[in-house]
């Protein structure tokens, strides 16, 4: 997006002066009362809208303006890489926290205006990050590298058994509580 090449991480003077807000991209603006346009509600682009107010009444700020008013210095975004349990092109009422990773570092399609176009996902994700940076807010991405949604992941199809911790019986170790765990020690 325009200005991306000049964008940079927002550095804090002192970590003791930080105010961190954890949020879920869809929850941030999904409700109609958020004042975000219908096209951008629950999407990356919701973060690019300024001047949003509760029910559009002009009294109580919402979304990015609300974060600025609170003095939030950092947002920690729940996982927004490609996750399995939401049909990206399906019913918009589907919800997941994002802790069921499929493709690490690929922006989740359900948060984009066009889940079928990888370029759109990337551009809109970058626009969200840039809008937060432009507001003086640092961005932290919550990541889950200790497991994948399925044992039949791209890792296992590439090099079977290598990327996962296995018991001597060839069954998957389940230290993550999700049916498998990546072998981060390799």
Regions found by a protein language model. Name each.
Residues 1-19, 29-38, 57:
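An acidic, Gly/Ser/Thr/Pro-rich helix-cap/linker signature
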Residues 26-186:
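Substrate-binding/active-site clefts of carbohydrate-active enzymes
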């Amino acid at each position: 997006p325009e200005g991306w090449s000049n964008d940079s991480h927002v550095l804090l003077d002192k970590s003791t002066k930080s105010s961190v807000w954890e949020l879920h991209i869809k929850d941030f603006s999904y409700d109609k009362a958020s004042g975000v346009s219908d096209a951008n509600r629950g999407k990356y682009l919701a973060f690019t809208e300024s001047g949003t107010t509760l029910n559009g009444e002009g009294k109580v700020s919402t979304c990015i303006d609300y974060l600025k008013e609170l003095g939030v210095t950092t947002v920690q975004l729940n996982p927004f890489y490609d996750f399995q349990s939401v049909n990206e092109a399906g019913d918009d009422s589907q919800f997941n926290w994002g802790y069921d990773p499929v493709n690490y570092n690929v922006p989740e399609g359900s948060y984009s205006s066009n889940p079928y176009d990888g370029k759109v996902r990337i551009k809109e994700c970058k626009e969200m990050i840039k809008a937060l940076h432009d507001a003086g807010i640092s961005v932290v991405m919550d990541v889950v590298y200790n497991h994948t949604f399925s044992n039949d992941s791209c890792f296992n199809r590439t090099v079977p058994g290598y990327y996962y911790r296995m018991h001597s019986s060839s069954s998957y170790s389940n230290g993550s509580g999700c049916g498998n765990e990546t072998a981060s020690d390799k």
